[in-house]
Amino acid sequence: MPMFRIRLPKPAALIAAGGIGACIATVAVPSAYAAAPAPADSRLGVTASLDRLPSIGERSTLTVNITAETDVKRAGLSLQLPPALRIVDRNPSLAAPTTDPFGQRTSRTLTLTPGTRTIELEVKAVATGPAQIQADISDIDRPDPRRAGHASVELTIGKAKGSTAKGMSVTKADATPVSGPTTPGRPVRPGAAAPAAPSTPPQAAAPGKRYAPVCVSGTLRNRFQSSEGGSWNSKASRDLPVSNANVTLWGRATAGGGTQKLAAGLTGNGDGTFKLCYTPSTSVTSQVWAEFQTQAGTMWSVVDGYNRRYSTTSNALSNVSGNKSLGTVYANSGQSRAWHAFDTLNKLWWDRGSTSTCWTSNQRDGRCTPITVQWYPGSTDGTYWTNRDDKVHLADSDPDSGHTTVHEAGHSLMGKLYNGWWPYVTNCSPHYINRTSSTTCGWTEGFADAVAFHTFKDTVMTWGNGSSMNLANDRGTRGMDWGDACEARVGTALVDLWSQVDGGWTKSNTMMSRERQSTFREYFLTDRPAYGLDSGPKARNILYGHTIQY
């Protein structure tokens, strides 16, 4: 496995590029989703830039350059502005912008010839805070990450002239208000100045006196955009609870007192609810608030470019006595992709096919290794996993696709099943999901595809730009190569074996945790029968339907 260096985020510039000429880290497990170098006749690229950093009320020119190295009959251009920016002078070639909780979106279908096309439009800053402009270009008729480009411009809009800065910091942030995605005000959070003392000062507990327990409840939710159910120019909007997130209840017993950890727990699986209780030391607790982190116990987490977990802090409750509710707390809008990736891993966790309380059966209870995802706004460090640090690296818009997140996590799962060992994989960079690569690439990538299919109960692959491809196949499927060197054939054959022969994938995963396979042939012919998994006529017929014959 080659070594590589994790690229840490740098302050964002005014210009961002994606697609053509993108630089990729050398990794051992290149993904079907990675923006790997593609043949010259299949490249699309896009850049986006602002001519100035606008403060609130000021305008700036957004310039988008689309580059093609081949003819593309229908290229889809999608532009998304955050709620803090508004289109004020639209280029007439673009569709009328639509507005939703995520900001404004406009698009256009283009016919491209080799060269560069430029589109300009005027935008205005209408609110302060972190902001991200995104541009996507893709081949509508041939969805594939190698025929697509993504660009991102990040800035933090200030109120006073000249106060807007490059880049955006959202690792630690306040919750987004229930009524909308942004707010000029900031809720009280740890370290903030203490409010005025309550009109009735709290009474300190007399020696030996105990006050009744206080419970604080609420629900954590996340608003995000999803490629599942969306399209290249309109991803689906989702508003869902966040499951199994670490939550800590903090407080100050008195107005001038120090911050204390009162209680900790997890949000509820499926509903995002929490109820944390503590025994106060005074009759009234001056302040109480909740902090949520993108970590589930110690089993999985999402971190930024510096390996820090994202955290969202609720508004503070004042003068607390008796049971209270924080109501619905929304993850900070700038962190929505981190929380989406986090909650996507929860789907995989509850159907991971393990007989232990770890990700895989070969790990002992209480001695589990986690799955870690690294993502940050504007990231170009993706899309891949490495077994050197057992970390998934997602690029900027990757978390919008749950399939992408789980595909990469599927590599981590295989690495755990193999206890850190990895096959010697050849002819896998680049590789195409529906084309022949090698039998080792077809096996490792096909397994990761199958993990995504199994988790989402489908055979549709989605990408972060909203495009998708249905990979359901048989011997008559056109546009897909035959055999076990094609990952789509391997992935769909695996899920059919699990569902139609094995009664789920737990037995297969247990077998994989005891034996190592470099190819699908080895998995099917050698190890399945050795562990009592069917490789007879019914199983072979499934493979035959997916053009795999042994």
From Swiss-Prot:
State the top-level EC class: hydrolase
- Location of this chain's protein in the cell: Secreted
Signal peptide: which range, if any?
1-34
Q: Where is the composition biased (Low complexity)?
A: 180-208
Give the Gene Ontology MF terms in alphabetical order: metal ion binding; metallopeptidase activity
Under the cellular component aspect of Gene Ontology, which terms does the record hold?
extracellular region
Disulphide bond pairs: none
The gene from which this protein is expressed is npr
Task: Enumerate the residue ranges of region (Disordered).
Answer: 160-209
Q: Describe how the cofactor binds.
A: Binds 1 zinc ion.
Q: Which residues form the propeptide?
A: 35-205
List the GO biological process terms: proteolysis
- Spell out the family assignment given in the record's similarity comment: Belongs to the peptidase M5 family.
Where does the UniProt entry say this protein principally localizes? secreted
Residues annotated for Zn(2+) binding in this entry: H407, H411, E445
Write down what this protein is called: Mycolysin
UniProt key word Endoplasmic reticulum = no
Q: Which organism is it from?
A: Streptomyces cacaoi
The EC number of this protein is 3.4.24.31
Cofactors: Zn(2+)
